Amino acid sequence: MGSTISPPSGEYLLEMRGINKSFPGVKALDNVNLNVRPHSIHALMGENGAGKSTLLKCLFGIYQKDSGSIVFQGKEVDFHSAKEALENGISMVHQELNLVLQRSVMDNMWLGRYPTKGMFVDQDKMYQDTKAIFDELDIDIDPRARVGTLSVSQMQMIEIAKAFSYNAKIVIMDEPTSSLTEKEVNHLFTIIRKLKERGCGIVYISHKMEEIFQLCDEITILRDGQWIATQPLEGLDMDKIIAMMVGRSLNQRFPDKENKPGDVILEVRHLTSLRQPSIRDVSFDLHKGEILGIAGLVGAKRTDIVETLFGIREKSSGTITLHGKKINNHTANEAINHGFALVTEERRSTGIYAYLDIGFNSLISNIRNYKNKVGLLDNSRMKSDTQWVIDSMRVKTPGHRTQIGSLSGGNQQKVIIGRWLLTQPEILMLDEPTRGIDVGAKFEIYQLIAELAKKGKGIIIISSEMPELLGITDRILVMSNGLVSGIVDTKTTTQNEILRLASLHL
């Protein structure tokens, strides 16, 4: 299915041809191709569940393909482990970094293959070899530093340098910028381009369309386990890529705004967190049926606002007024009782219990309310409410007993939102609600948010994606270094104005 630009044989570093893989009852990959040239950055895109992960697991030998061939540097290969693939020159930098935090940078670089001098590890050689690679890639990190003291972006650099130390010809990067600042992203892109100049083929996986156009030369698109197209980025636009990914044209990235903000339901005045550095003197109003965005650069303390409102952080001063009555949320339970709900930023670590089912994950925030008169859990009500979450949030799942970790990121997020709606909140706060979610699922999340606002919920959204804030909010509160630097009307503001305000107190 689809079309490709096919150069003469031998121009590819990696050729995955006609890869098929089935699981019981599921055709995961159906005749999928991926061809990567040297000196190129190749985007691999598709919605969650399109087959990207399965294809790469077949490449690394984690899954054995049913049929098809893998040709690397002109030779057919069939790896049986990621270690074997790495030793042959194919490396992957995972979204979840794979480093030993308690060990030094150079220990992590050469783990399992330390240079030796006699019976001992040659520390000097390990240091010099690490420093030489870092110098070549313009990485400014002390090889002796403990990894646990470094930023996420620095850890990314170490993973890339480690791949380089194996003389990797193919480097696969899975959502490498998901936790990076703009400055860190630019540095990462510089290093990726250096790898390209040295002849590497980079496979770049990201849901951030702007990055794809900024960085990549070619793109392969998968949908529902099928190969759709491999084409140069030149001549493509965002709408064409989205249409190929989702199988239909998305005429709009954001739903129409049908909500009509009403009376003020939440008044925040001079809110300051006890633990500093954090928020200071934060004031704003939230109206019934309003979607209020919170923007700011990394470190602006956006998350601190919602954590303080939700009782996770203690306030030292200021007032929170709900429907004209002053309240105090000393704990999350108090906040829930006052009608607040918080969808946290880190879905995997603080949002879901990955190995438990949808039922448990749907009900856990409200579990005490399911006890009957004799103190036992009311299974009938629990099953009914779980089904309500699945139906009303439009969760794609075989059933409520399905392990939530097996769902796509978009469907996991729908379950989390549904879980909080069961607490019947008036104020719904969402921190980076579409991070790591594909473009089709993003639109569905936006639709849910718009529907909730239309029903009168007061909604606060924190997002690092400026187009998202401009596309779905009514107003945007801009934070800078813990202070409110402005509140703007979404209809009349610009991205440049928001960035100017975000830099005001740096």
Swiss-Prot record:
CDD domains to which the protein is assigned, alphabetical: ABC_Carb_Monos_I, ABC_Carb_Monos_II
Signal peptide: none
GO-annotated cellular components: plasma membrane
Location in or out of the cell: Cell inner membrane
Substrates-to-products reaction catalysed: D-galactose(out) + ATP + H2O = D-galactose(in) + ADP + phosphate + H(+); methyl beta-D-galactoside(out) + ATP + H2O = methyl beta-D-galactoside(in) + ADP + phosphate + H(+)
Pfam families in the record: ABC_tran
UniProt entry keywords in alphabetical sequence: ATP-binding, Cell inner membrane, Cell membrane, Membrane, Nucleotide-binding, Repeat, Sugar transport, Translocase, Transport
Mechanisms controlling activity: Stimulated 3-fold by galactose and inhibited by vanadate, N-ethylmaleimide, and 5-methoxyindole-2-carboxylic acid.
Superkingdom to which the source organism belongs: Bacteria
pH-dependent activity: Optimum pH is about 8.
Domain (ABC transporter): residue spans on this chain: 14-249, 259-506
Coiled-coil segments: none
Residue intervals passing through the bilayer: none
The protein's Enzyme Commission number: 7.5.2.11
Membrane topology designation: Peripheral membrane protein
Subunit structure: The complex is composed of one ATP-binding protein (MglA), two transmembrane proteins (MglC) and a solute-binding protein (MglB).
PANTHER family assigned: CARBOHYDRATE TRANSPORT ATP-BINDING PROTEIN MG119-RELATED (PTHR43790), GALACTOSE_METHYL GALACTOSIDE IMPORT ATP-BINDING PROTEIN MGLA (PTHR43790:SF7)
Protein name: Galactose/methyl galactoside import ATP-binding protein MglA
Source organism phylogeny: Bacteria, Pseudomonadati, Pseudomonadota, Gammaproteobacteria, Enterobacterales
